[in-house]
């Protein structure tokens, strides 16, 4: 299936996400901070289908990582995760670089849906409207 780089400093979250996505058939590479993720990305010449990154991390945060990836590998899809509302706000205005932001905590179902949507390239607005329609909103 897809080749996914996960950048997450919380080992429990990183392992949960990695196991779930590997179980779904994806090839997973893990990095415990944004700096290491950027190094891996360069070493592998951006050979990933998706970067799934936390926003708040040591060395290089997810926003800086997304900017680096957008500069060096503009076709790579970036999906961010965060548990901090102020960090979600930092991602606003970067819609051209970032597919979406997943708020933490999230369920396995939400993770899998967001990853599938990102890999399929579904526009975020269309995805949101479809979910609202399904929920009767």
Predicted ranges, named:
Residues 106-115, 123, 127-128:
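C-terminal output helix
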Residues 8:
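Conserved acidic carboxylate
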């Amino acid at each position: 299936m897809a080749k996914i780089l996960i950048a997450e400093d919380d080992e429990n979250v990183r392992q949960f996400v990695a196991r779930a996505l590997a179980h779904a058939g994806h090839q997973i590479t893990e990095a415990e901070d944004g700096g290491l993720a950027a190094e891996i990305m360069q070493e592998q010449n951006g050979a990933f289908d998706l970067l799934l990154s936390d926003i708040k991390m040591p060395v290089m945060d997810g926003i800086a990582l997304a900017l680096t990836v957008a500069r060096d590998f503009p076709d790579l899809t970036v999906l961010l995760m965060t548990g901090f509302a102020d960090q979600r706000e930092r991602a606003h205005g970067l819609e051209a670089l970032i597919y979406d932001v997943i708020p933490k905590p999230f369920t396995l179902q939400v993770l899998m849906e967001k990853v599938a949507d990102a890999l399929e390239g579904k526009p975020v607005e269309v995805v949101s409207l479809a979910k609202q329609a399904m929920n009767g909103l």
